[in-house]
Structures are given as C-alpha cells and as structure tokens.
C-alpha cells in the first residue's frame, strides 16, 4: 500500500484494493514534468483515499496531480475522479464515460426499478432470488463514486494526446464498456489498455436492464479486430487488472 513500481521512464504502476473476487485495480501515474497525469483512480472508499494520501506524499511527492484520465465509466476506474477534481485536477475521458458517470451518480434507487424487475423476469431469474431482490436496496453507482463536478475534456477516436512526454494515439473499444479509451504510444512500446486489454482474464461482457437487447460480445469481437493492425509482440501493455504483459497479437486472437 502506498507504493509504486516504475514500469517505464516516468511511468509508475500502482495497485488499489477492490472488495470483490477481482481484488485489485491497476492505476498509473505519468510524469508530465511539473505535474502528474493519473490513469484511473479506484473506488471511492475510505481505504482507497487513505492509500492515495500515502501515494501523494510518497511516490508522487513534489508535484500535484494535474490531470485524471478515465479509460471508461466503471466505478473501480472512475470512483475518485471527483475527489481529485476537488484538489485541482482536470478530467479527461470519452463523452460516453462522462455522461454515464454523471447520470448514474445522480440516479440512486432505494429498490430496483420496475424496468429492472421486468428484466430479471425476462432473463429467467430464479423465483426465490427474484422475490428477495424485489425489496432489497440495489447497488448504486454513488455508493463508491464521488460526485463529479461539471467540466471535462473529451477524448475521441483517432485523437493524439500527450501524456508523460509521449504522444499517444487514442483508440476506442467496446463490449466491456461503451467507448472505452485505449492509448498507444508513438514514441516507445507502451499501450495503456484499461479493461479492454487484459492478460489472463476476460473482461466482463454484461447486458443490463438499461439496454436489454445489447450485444456486447459482438462489440467486443469487432474491437479486437480493429486493434489487431496496431498490435506488436514487443508492446508492453499496461492493463486495468493483473500484470503488465507482452504478446498483444496473440492475446487479441485469444480474446
């Protein structure tokens, strides 16, 4: 806790805990000279904030966090964006991630919505489980995501962005989360993959009540095909979970 590993010049890899079977999320800090850019943030929990406080006076000491980049809208990646923004950091992410995060944090529910209950039935939920869930408080996004103030910088497919003294091409993936941003360095062999590019586990491809006819598997497969022309064996992929890895062409084929 409160420690980092240097994985490339000016690139720090840090790990934050998650209260689930997949018990961690990877976050990264890239040296922008007079400040840091942080890629993803972890959940908004007391424990995660405490770890960040250690990181800010430890490996990141001496310069502020000037920018947060969110790869996608899931709470383990975007949970503390608002906390960093209150400390002066700017926020960059895709429009879809921004809108989903704002919408979900402002839309808590004490019990499942009628649409969610109908989706449970449509999906064949066990009757006993359905009866129990009807009156249970569901997970709410705001349970582990700090409120995000208005104002962000949009990331788009095909853009070039400078982070940590490198120029990166932004390429979007889908399936795990809509408009998931990945970053491919033009200056060395680094790729920031978020949950779109993972080494030894498959990203969750979920269908939810908000879009019950979605086909995330098709979205995922199309994304893998789009990435293949840019993948090389020597790229070091820094993903959202597990370990950094090489051999991206084979991994895209496996996924």
Predicted segments with their positions:
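Conserved beta-strand hairpin/beta-sheet module of binuclear metal-dependent hydrolase folds
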Residues: 3-63, 183-199
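Short Pro/Gly-enriched beta-strand edge/turn motifs at strand-loop
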Residues: 7-14, 137-144, 164-166
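Conserved HGGG/HGGXW glycine-rich cap/lid loop of the alpha/beta-hydrolase fold
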Residues: 15-18, 77, 172
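Residues at the C-termini of beta-strands that transition into short coil/loop
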Residues: 15-17, 95, 241
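Short, charged, surface-exposed secondary-structure boundary motifs
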Residues: 24, 100-106, 201-205
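Metallo-beta-lactamase
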Residues: 36-46, 141-153, 160, 167-253
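Active-site HxH/HxHxD metal-binding segment of metal-dependent hydrolases
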Residues: 44-48, 53-161, 189, 254
